[in-house]
Every structure is written in C-alpha cells, then in structure tokens.
Design a protein with these regions (language model features):
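A short, Lys/Arg-rich alpha-helix, primarily the initiator
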Residues: 1-9
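Alpha-helical residues within the helix-turn-helix
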Residues: 8, 19, 51
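Residue-level detection of the helix-turn-helix DNA-binding "recognition helix"
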Residues: 8, 22, 33-35, 65
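Short alpha-helical DNA-recognition segment
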Residues: 12-31
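DNA major-groove recognition helix of helix-turn-helix/homeodomain DNA-binding modules
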Residues: 43-59
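Short, charged recognition helix plus adjacent turn
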Residues: 58-76
Length: 76
C-alpha cells in the first residue's frame, strides 16, 4: 500500500492529512508523487503521518528493508 492509498482510504484530503500530522502539505505531495522517497523520510515525519492516518509504518513504507531496519530500531 502507499501513503496516498492509505490517506484516500481514510477519506482525507492532502490538506487535512497535512494539518492532522503537522507535515507540510507540499512535502506530503512530494512523497505521494514520488518526488521524495518516503523510505528516506525522518522517523519523526513517518510517525506523525502514521498517527494522523491511524496506521502502521508498514502501510506507508514501500521498501521492506527500510521497514525492517526501523522496526529493529524502534524495539531497542
């Protein structure tokens, strides 16, 4: 699944998602359009998005290796 798919499932506009998460709407658009790789996002940004969308990291990250590394880091 992608960030955009999760956001749409929650019936949120980009602006609403940005406001809920505190992530700049332009940055959110860049992640959704692939201009910026969400797998390289700061952990704090990922967590803000997950909290706003009520989802897990695995639902918005597209790279399995990145997800595994983050899960290991968070468990420490």
């Amino acid at each position: 699944m992608s960030l955009q798919e999760v956001r749409r499932q929650r019936n949120l506009s980009q602006r609403e998602c940005a406001e809920r998460s505190g992530v700049n709407v332009r940055i959110l658009q860049f992640y959704e359009q692939g201009i910026r790789d969400i797998n390289g996002a700061k952990l704090v940004t990922l967590l803000k998005l997950c909290n706003a969308l009520d989802c897990g990291l695995g639902e918005i990250l597209t790279d399995e290796e990145t997800l595994k590394e983050l899960e290991i880091y968070i468990r420490k």
